[in-house]
A protein has these predicted regions:
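Residues that scaffold the ATP/ADP-binding catalytic core of kinase and kinase-like folds
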Residues: 73, 81, 133, 148-150, ...
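Conserved G/P- and acidic residue-centered "switch" motifs that form tight phosphate/ATP-binding loops
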Residues: 124, 142
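Flexible, glycine/small-residue-enriched loop-and-beta-strand segment within the central core
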Residues: 25, 36, 42-116, 143-144
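Membrane-proximal basic amphipathic "stem/tether" segments
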Residues: 1-29
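Short conserved catalytic/interaction loops centered on acidic-Pro-aromatic/His motifs
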Residues: 119, 131-141, 150
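Beta-rich strand-turn-strand
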Residues: 108-122, 128-132
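C-terminal segments of enzyme domains that contribute to small-molecule binding surfaces
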Residues: 8, 32, 87-112, 144-191
Length: 191
């Protein structure tokens, strides 16, 4: 009875209560309708939280560990107004989305927030909360995620992106798989 009265009052006041009553606001990445996943990328049960059709774009050869969460928009909550409570049902989530480059590894239990772009070759340490863009060929970690180290020099990172091995055909990649164990300098010199 209390729930009926509560819903009646919320309707009378013009408050959208549907989001409060929902039990599930997420989908598994594999089931998400607004995702684009590149060749050979995989996940182990990543979850997408969304309240809009903001896209998730994942490049080729990405490894996404178990319990990774993608929060693709702000869920109608504002941080720069008097209250963050979503009073009006006509509030629209700011569509931000998430963009992940190629050859990215996202560690166990990490959370990637809306508006973030993760560069090619980046590594996200387990348990990180990524709130800002991640440069190519860097390792970030923590809450919020911060630079831990660069995997190679900035010049080498640019050259690796020019080589773009992830765009080679599968047969070419398979024939060169042992070269992936080379140092960045040796690999760049070879290709």
């Amino acid at each position: 009875m209390i729930n009926l009265i509560r819903r009646f009052l919320w309707r009378l006041l013009g408050i959208d209560y549907s989001h409060i009553l929902r039990v599930i606001d997420f989908k598994y990445l594999k089931e998400d309708a607004f995702k684009s996943i590149g060749n050979k990328s995989y996940d182990n049960g990543a979850i997408v939280y969304r309240w809009s059709d903001a896209p998730i774009t994942i490049g080729k050869y990405c490894s996404i560990s178990y319990d990774v969460k993608f929060v693709v928009d702000d869920g109608k909550h504002r941080y720069n107004t008097v209250t963050s409570y979503p009073f009006k049902s006509n509030q629209i989530s700011a569509k931000r989305g998430i963009e992940i480059g190629n050859d990215v590894w996202i560690g166990l239990g990490s959370t990637i927030l809306y508006g973030v772009k993760i560069g090619d070759g980046a590594t996200i340490a387990a348990g990180s909360v990524v709130t800002k863009d991640v440069e190519p060929y860097t390792v970030v970690g923590g809450v919020p995620a911060k630079l831990i180290k660069e995997k190679c020099t900035r010049e080498e990172a640019k050259l690796m992106q020019e080589i773009a091995w992830w765009n080679w055909g599968e047969e070419v990649i398979e024939s060169r798989v042992n070269d992936f164990r080379l140092s960045y300098a040796d690999y760049i010199q070879k290709y």
